[in-house]
Amino acid sequence: MAKLVIIRGNSGSGKSSLTKKLQAHYGRGTLLIAQDTIRRDMLKEKVEPGNLSIDLTESLACFGYEHDFLVLVEGFYETDIYCHMLERLRTLFGPQTLAYYYDLTFEEAVRHHQTRSKKVDFSPADMKRWWKECDFLGWEVATFTDQDSLEDAFQENSKK
């Protein structure tokens, strides 16, 4: 049976680390859909309503559903732009949908970002410009905060 796991949060919060760990743990039959890969790398799209990454993300998730994959959808996925697509996926996957949100402080996200190889790709000033406080969908099953480690987030997700 297909399952959808949505991992959202601001830049530098730990989403990519968690989804990579989940994909490594579950292995074959896991489809990782990373917003940065789809929107920025593959399509060179801007973050704006109607951008083509919305449809491609949904199409890839539907592919995963049709093939009974564990589908990991990871990214910022701002609610004002992506909520309708995420709602459609929630409807498609039904009760096999789990959504998580990284609700870190800006300072913690910057601290985390400084430990990554991507730290040269964008600055704390960029992160501040993109920052959205408490950008919840309203149907998350759990929220991760400054106190939660990668292992805490992994354990929370892998027990579901």
Segments (PLM) and residue ranges:
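Hydrophobic anchor at the beta1->P-loop junction of P-loop NTPases
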Residues: I7
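P-loop (Walker A) phosphate-binding loop of NTP-binding proteins
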Residues: N10
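ATP-binding Walker
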Residues: S13
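Walker A/P-loop
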Residues: S16
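Conserved substrate/cofactor phosphate-moiety recognition/catalytic segment
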Residues: T19-H67
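Glycine-rich phosphate-binding loop used to anchor ATP phosphates in small-molecule kinases
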Residues: L52-G94
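Conserved phosphate-donor/acceptor-positioning beta-strand/loop module used by diverse small-molecule
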Residues: F93-H112
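Small-molecule kinase domains that catalyze NTP-dependent phosphoryl transfer to phosphate-bearing small molecules
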Residues: T115-K160
